[in-house]
Amino acid sequence: MSLTANCSFDLSVSDDFVGKRSGYIHIGDSTNNSGWALHSVPITSVKNGKGPRVLVLSGNHGDEYEGQTASLDLARRLEVEDVKGEILIIPVLSILASAAGTRLWPDGTNFNRVFPGKVDGTIAEKLAYFLSHDLFPTCDSVIDQHSGGRSMHFIPSITMVWVSNVELRNEMLRQSLMCKSEFTILGGEQPSTNPDSLLPGDVVRQGKAVATGEFGGSGVTTAQSMAVISSSLENYLRGMGVYVGKDVAASVYADSIDHPGKIIDSRDYSVSFASASADGIYENRVDLHQQVQAGDLVGLIHDFKSADNKVIEVRARRSGIVALVRGYSPVTTGDVVCMIGELFPSIEAFEKSLEEKSAR
């Protein structure tokens, strides 16, 4: 249990408790302007007796506003009669980064790389410790909503890491598909990164399912991205049995797509990612949803300092659908500028492909 962070209302009420409460996760701080200070993160609980407890998270990175907007809207409109069990909502995890319009906290912390946190660490580490030790163990499931932020732009979609635990993987896949998004992107672990240091990785380490999504990017909300994330969140909560209210968002989005449940397989990052090989100004030469072949031109890097130097071409390393493009033009060497995956019309088609490959 954390000794340096606490909730302003009781999180351990009885199963029969009924009520809607809003408050803060308070984290002890001391600054130049306030010797005795609290860093306060908003949290809302809507509980209606016995049932699952589901934790809704967003704002893990400050410049990913789609999830923050959807979660704030959910926290405002949820009433007790909409819920069976408890929905906990932390809409803006990284408040300082969100206010600054940056991915990272002002001190340079990437909140999605500090788990399981430290009880006596920085503010970010204390918050991560509270989540990892006080909240995650008490929840039946967690949804962590992301987007590409300022630097990237995804097809608004549910995403899922292909974890090694088969039983947990199947449950995560089930939860991902219950969101009824048009696209679910399957990926591997991020290269050169400790998966347990990520918020979703810490949930998985504890043997619990986590749902995630990349709902757009470029540091903006769009009508499409908000439709996808709002309906996916509503469908997820309904599928978990904790939301029993009206279809506020899901029915609107359902009318705008031809077929939910398409799968984009980008698990092999060695060929799915295209990266900048030099510093410069990046020009996208493909759009989201576009089909490309291995070797196709996906982007150009222009030299900042000279119009005489030739542009550097960035080419696809595999065939498939473009699932991510660059959202912010300046790039440095190694920045991911495009992601391509193999498109399947359904989970059944994807699973059939896996069976065929394993039989070879």
Task: Identify the residue ranges that each predicted region occupies.
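Structured catalytic-domain cores with a bias toward divalent-metal coordination
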Residues: 1-360
